[in-house]
């Protein structure tokens, strides 16, 4: 890669509680540990990753808007906003940055209201049910995607 690519790792509401919150669904690894692993991968691949987590929709939207023409790829776990946020979807579409949707748990094995996503049909891909490893797979997909650009 001739240029240093920039990736934004976005995490939505309640993901700051990973490791303590419902480990049956989300595992026992903290968000900080996931971010550290992604930063290690970023160093190995000579890319820059910014990690951002917010419990409010507006802060996530603002971060997406700030990424316009600044970021090459977004990795996003919208958490509960997956099923409710047209505004986050519209923000992602507005900036035209390719993204992968990530979920720690298999949302299709859970409550029916979790089966619908406002992001899946506009994402480059969706990874769910693979726990923290899903973030690594999403990162590696982003590397492959950016290498082909």
UniProtKB/Swiss-Prot annotation:
Record site feature (Transition state stabilizer), residues: 21
Residues the record marks as active site:
26 (proton acceptor), 103 (proton donor)
What are the GO BP annotations of this UniProt entry? amino acid biosynthetic process; aromatic amino acid family biosynthetic process; chorismate biosynthetic process; quinate catabolic process
Q: Which EC number applies?
A: 4.2.1.10
Pathway noted in the entry: Metabolic intermediate biosynthesis; chorismate biosynthesis; chorismate from D-erythrose 4-phosphate and phosphoenolpyruvate: step 3/7
Uppermost EC category: lyase
Matching PROSITE patterns: DEHYDROQUINASE_II (PS01029)
Query: Could you tell me which Pfam families the record lists for this protein?
Result: DHquinase_II
Keywords attached to this Swiss-Prot or TrEMBL record, sorted alphabetically, are: Amino-acid biosynthesis, Aromatic amino acid biosynthesis, Lyase
**Gene Ontology molecular function, alphabetical:** 3-dehydroquinate dehydratase activity
Range of residues in the leader sequence: none
Q: At which positions is substrate bound?
A: 77, 83, 90, 104-105, 114
Q: What reaction is this protein's catalytic activity?
A: 3-dehydroquinate = 3-dehydroshikimate + H2O
Give the family per the record. Answer: Belongs to the type-II 3-dehydroquinase family.
Name the job this protein performs.
Answer: Catalyzes a trans-dehydration via an enolate intermediate.
User: What HAMAP family does the record point to?
Assistant: AroQ
Q: How the protein assembles, per its UniProt entry?
A: Homododecamer.
Query: Which protein is depicted?
Result: 3-dehydroquinate dehydratase
Instruction: Identify the species of origin.
Output: Haemophilus influenzae (strain ATCC 51907 / DSM 11121 / KW20 / Rd)
Lineage in the entry? Bacteria, Pseudomonadati, Pseudomonadota, Gammaproteobacteria, Pasteurellales
């Amino acid at each position: 890669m001739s240029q240093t690519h920039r990736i934004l790792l976005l995490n939505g509401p309640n993901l700051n509680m990973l490791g303590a919150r419902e480990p049956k669904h989300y595992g026992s690894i903290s968000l900080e540990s996931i971010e550290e692993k992604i930063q290690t991968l970023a160093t190995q691949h000579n890319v820059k990753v910014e990690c951002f987590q917010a419990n409010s929709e507006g802060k996530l939207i603002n971060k997406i808007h700030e990424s316009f023409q600044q970021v090459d790829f977004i990795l996003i776990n919208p958490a509960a906003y997956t099923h409710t946020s047209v505004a986050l979807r519209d923000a992602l579409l507005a900036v035209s940055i390719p993204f992968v949707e990530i979920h720690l748990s298999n949302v299709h094995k859970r409550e029916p209201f979790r089966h619908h996503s406002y992001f899946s049909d506009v994402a480059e891909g969706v990874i769910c049910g693979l726990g923290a490893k899903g973030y690594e797979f999403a990162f590696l997909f982003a590397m492959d995607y950016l290498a082909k650009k």
